[in-house]
A protein has these predicted regions:
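Catalytic center-proximal scaffold of phosphoryl-transfer enzymes
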Residues: 1-187
């Protein structure tokens, strides 16, 4: 479930840590918002120090899609293809109705690892090029992938971890839209 934490107009880390309090979390997924980059090792509660910080792959895909469509950078297509193949694996697991334990095993398989190696190699290849040879959008997407590599691939550690938070964001989006409509109605 995606929950956006705001207090006095802030999405800061303190808002999230105050909300979590002493709860124990196995994992927490976010976008790459800077306030959450230290989740798992700097949260106030001692019992959250081992929390796995996951970063949503859908946010990464959107960055490469933007590089392809707005930046007109065809090199983004190669990385998008690899990410799409990771999603194809996840959809096949869903269709088969496998257990979280089986999903963990398959995510640790050569098939998944090969895709992650391929993704990393393409990332490193693109980053080795002079920045002038790519669009600013592709540079942003590459830097995001590089910076959050561990968090973006952490979903493979446990079959219970989602690859993204799309379902939760779609749910929250409906609530947010309804709230915005209600507020504008009362104005």
């Amino acid at each position: 479930m995606a929950i956006f934490f705001y207090d006095n107009g802030s999405r800061g880390r303190e808002v999230l840590t105050d909300f979590i309090g002493d709860a124990e979390l196995k994992a927490l997924m976010s976008d790459g918002y800077n306030a959450y980059t230290f989740i798992g090792n700097e949260l106030k509660s001692e019992n959250l120090k081992d929390t796995v910080h996951l970063v949503c792959l859908a946010h990464l895909m959107a960055k490469f899609q933007k590089a392809l469509e707005q930046g007109k950078d065809e090199n983004a297509r190669i990385l998008l293809d690899v990410i799409n193949r990771l999603y194809t694996l996840e959809r096949s697991y869903d269709a088969e109705g496998i257990t979280n334990e089986e999903r963990t095993m398959r995510r640790g398989s050569l098939e998944t690892k090969s895709l992650l190696i391929d993704l990393r190699q393409h990332l490193d290849f693109e980053l080795a090029k002079p920045e002038e040879q790519r669009s600013g959008y592709l540079t942003e997407a590459l830097n995001y992938l590089n910076h959050f590599w561990t968090e973006l691939t952490a979903y493979t550690q446990d079959g219970a971890f989602p690859i993204d938070n799309n379902m939760a964001e779609r749910t929250v989006r409906c609530l947010t839209y309804s709230t915005q409509q209600l507020i504008s109605f009362w104005k």
